[in-house]
């Protein structure tokens, strides 16, 4: 699996375009396309935004786990 293939799969499964997702993240479509292509590293802010949009944990996006569910918040 490519570096950021999961973000493309999640976007497609959610029926979102790169343009729509860019607007949600307040970045350009071009910047977002670089993330999906793996030609630019995703900033922590965008990574957190993606996790919030898709309701998955950041580790899933980074291929550190196959568990999609968000981790419980620690108080």
Where are these regions (language model features)?
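DNA major-groove recognition helix of helix-turn-helix/homeodomain DNA-binding modules
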Residues: 26, 45-60
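Alpha-helical residues within the helix-turn-helix
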Residues: 12, 23, 52
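Short, charged recognition helix plus adjacent turn
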Residues: 62-75
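Short, conserved catalytic or interaction motifs in soluble domains
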Residues: 37
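A short, Lys/Arg-rich alpha-helix, primarily the initiator
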Residues: 1-13
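Short alpha-helical DNA-recognition segment
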Residues: 15-34
């Amino acid at each position: 699996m490519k570096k950021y293939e999961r973000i493309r799969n999640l976007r497609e499964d959610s029926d979102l375009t790169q343009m729509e997702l860019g607007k949600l993240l307040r970045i350009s479509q071009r910047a977002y396309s670089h993330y999906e292509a793996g030609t630019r590293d995703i900033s922590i802010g965008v990574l957190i935004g993606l996790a919030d949009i898709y309701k998955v944990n950041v580790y899933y996006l980074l291929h550190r786990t196959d568990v999609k569910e968000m981790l419980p918040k620690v108080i």
